[in-house]
From Swiss-Prot:
The lineage of its organism: Bacteria, Bacillati, Actinomycetota, Actinomycetes, Micrococcales. Associates with the EF-Tu.GDP complex and induces the exchange of GDP to GTP. It remains bound to the aminoacyl-tRNA.EF-Tu.GTP complex up to the GTP hydrolysis stage on the ribosome. GO terms for cellular component: cytoplasm. Pfam families: EF_TS. The gene is tsf. The keyword Cytoplasm applies. Disulfide bonds: none annotated. Belongs to the EF-Ts family. InterPro entries: EF-Ts_dimer_sf (IPR036402), Transl_elong_EFTs/EF1B (IPR001816), Transl_elong_EFTs/EF1B_dimer (IPR014039), Transl_elong_Ts_CS (IPR018101), UBA-like_sf (IPR009060). This is Elongation factor Ts. Residues 80-83 are annotated as: Involved in Mg(2+) ion dislocation from EF-Tu.
Amino acid sequence: MVDISMADVRLLRERLGVGVMDSRNALIEAGGDIERAVEILRLKGLKSAEKREGRSVSEGLVVSRQFATHAVLAELCCETDFVAKSDRFLALSERVADLVSDADSLETALRVRCDEGSVADLIALEAAVLGENVALRRFARVEGSRFSVYMHRTSSDLPPQVGVILAYEGHDDATARFIAQHIAFAAPEYLSVGDIPQGILQRERDLLTEISRGEGKPEEVLPQIVEGRLVKLYKQNVLLEQDYVRDNKVTISKVLEATGLRVISFARFRVGT
């Protein structure tokens, strides 16, 4: 049998975060070759990660990076809040955020190259060490030159679970910050009514028409009734139409008009939703 030194075992543990026996067995299988042992453990980690892929990931955190011309928001998920607040998971999220900072989609983010192969490989290997399914669930890139980034903790002992990036034009940074906070709490899906996909809008219009007809409303006034009821949909889902959370007597569009701000775009993630 190959003589395995504790120094090599310790080195392998430090590199991959695996247990003593796993490190020792990998070194034995690799004939004492540390790099080969690393590959053996990585392969085992990827295989064990595949077995966990179907398990629900409803915990985790959001992390962001901001640059001169763009900002990115990522949601890294795991199975339990215990892992979500662990130092290793937090370190993983920071490394992933750095690696994917130039990506333009979730698919390209997962393919970004790193020492472990790709970001997807890195996450799978760390999942093996953490013993949970871990996934980069969502990724958004927001273009612009001025940003307000707001990260919200839903619990003081957990990392941020709600994240918002707001790209805007104007100079009222304080109001931009308040609007980013508004987005975090009001959860709009669209910036303007024009951003709602026509298919979704038409389905909602058809549904409201049938509801109104079932209530016995006259056919000739159904279009007006439906359009009136669509206002509720807009209030729930469209940022510019929402009542401002700091003053519900005015809408976000009125706040922007009064302060000279213009929202270019935004991204919002809440872990597990």
